[in-house]
Amino acid sequence: MTIGMIGLGRMGNHMRSRLRSKDIETIGYDIDPEVSDVSSIAELCDGLGTGPRIVWLMLPNQLVDETIEALVPLLRADDIVIDGGNSRWTLDAPRAERLAAHGVSYLDCGVSGGVWGETNGYGIMVGGPEEAVRTVWPVLQALAPEDGGLVHAGGVGAGHFAKMVHNGIEYAMMQAYAEGYELLCADSPVTDVPAVFDAWRQGTVIRSWLLDLCSAALADEPDLASIRGWADDSGEGRWTVEEAIDRAVPMPAISAALFARFSSRQDDSPAMNLIAAMRNQFGGHAIHNS
């Protein structure tokens, strides 16, 4: 089996390597010729042989539609396009319809595992029609860990929806560890915070891979002094909260984690400035001048 991989950045390059290590021939294309196997998308498609051809897109969401448009004249009926990036799930149905008009199947695939996935395997959540999923299943199994981590989540959009919720949960878990770290460091009786995090990794109910990463970071730099407390959000946390609002699903922990990231990017807080002013107005409470 040969597949094409378009987008060989931080994730795509490692995924190509893992597929090759599992004896799945993979032809990669990227705008960076240093990592690309071919010089164009057309050359990539020509190299995929006969039968249902599989093209995996590992691209930023904003590049997916234009890449699909470039692929349409190069694809044949029964080919399969997989979007493995972090696209919003609501975009999947229109993309599937666009390709279906040419007899091409579309699968949306949420992928988790980061830079460690090449070694440990990737968590894979795929959405789309059963027949197309069966065709690509050997590829998905090669990417996934040996003991699981692979699910056909449902129809078109289900893979990206599952990955969106996964990322929302990730936000909340990270925020909980971060708040615990701050309290341990805040004039507490604990004298070795990194050792506490390391001890939590074994036998406790809060052990996780994220906790392992916390422990590794604190082992490198216990006070994290070289790191600015600024946390970006990639968009999926926002989408999770928006979907919860649309469905009237209570989501206090994930919402708070998202808003905490917004707070991290403020040099000063206009909201807190006004609260301080109001406290001064009604109670004569002290104001700390900037």
Regions found by a protein language model. Name each.
Residues I31-P94, E118-G127:
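Rossmann-like NAD(P)-binding element
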Residues M1-G9, H14-E25, W89, A93, ...:
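Metal- and O2-centered redox machinery and metal/ROS homeostasis
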Residues T135, G157-H285:
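Helical "substrate-binding/catalytic lid" subdomain
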Residues I3, T67, R88-A178:
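Rossmann-fold dinucleotide-binding core
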Residues T26, Y106-L107, M251:
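Hydrophobic beta-strand scaffold residues
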Residues M1-I54, D78, V115-G117, N280:
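NAD(P)+-binding Rossmann beta1-loop-alpha1 motif at the extreme N-terminus of oxidoreductases
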